[in-house]
Amino acid sequence: MKCYFFGTNLHEQKLISRQGLISFTVPDYGVLFRAQYIGNRYECEYAAGIALIRFLQLNMEHFDGKPITLMTDSPIVVYQVNNKLAAINSLQKFRDLFLFYKRKLKFDLQWVPTKMNRAEMGLEGLAVNKNSPRFNFDIFDESTRRKTRPHRNADESVQIS
């Protein structure tokens, strides 16, 4: 079963750690997930893959026994995880976590051109599957938790003039 992931930051200078987007899709089940993520381009790419892996792990009853191939347009993630390129220090924890899950869940990781990465595309390329099972999306933990900005307390009043 092919599963796709995509991550990017939304700043024109992609290596600056700013607001980004992570996305994954499981087309066979009509699943599309998107969330904001703070990080540079490569951190967002890794976070998208880790979010997909955690989704697969949480919902293994729907994927067990099926060969799983993760597809991404990130050559950095593919080459580092497949040991063709050394990971720089800032990406080491992401790569190590990816390798841990790869050994545990036994999936393949392949590069795909951006125009074929279904997680990067809009909704029009995703079919609705009315028979899709109910999935658990509780995929964030401390290593990939979305960073949030402090919110005002609910009891604080706002003055409008």
Regions found by a protein language model. Give the residues of each.
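A structural signal for isolated positions on well-ordered beta-strands in alpha/beta enzyme cores
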Residues: 2, 69, 108-110
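RNase H-like nuclease fold core
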Residues: 1-43, 55, 160
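Acidic active-site catalytic centers that drive phospho-/nucleotidyl reactions
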Residues: 6, 45, 73, 120
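Acidic/histidine-rich, metal-coordinating catalytic segments
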Residues: 68-78
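Acidic helix/loop or adjacent segment enriched in Glu/Asp that either coordinates divalent metal
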Residues: 32-70
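C-terminal functional segments of enzyme domains
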Residues: 14, 80-161
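Short, flexible active-site-adjacent loop segments at beta-strand->alpha-helix junctions, enriched
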Residues: 9, 74-76, 113-115
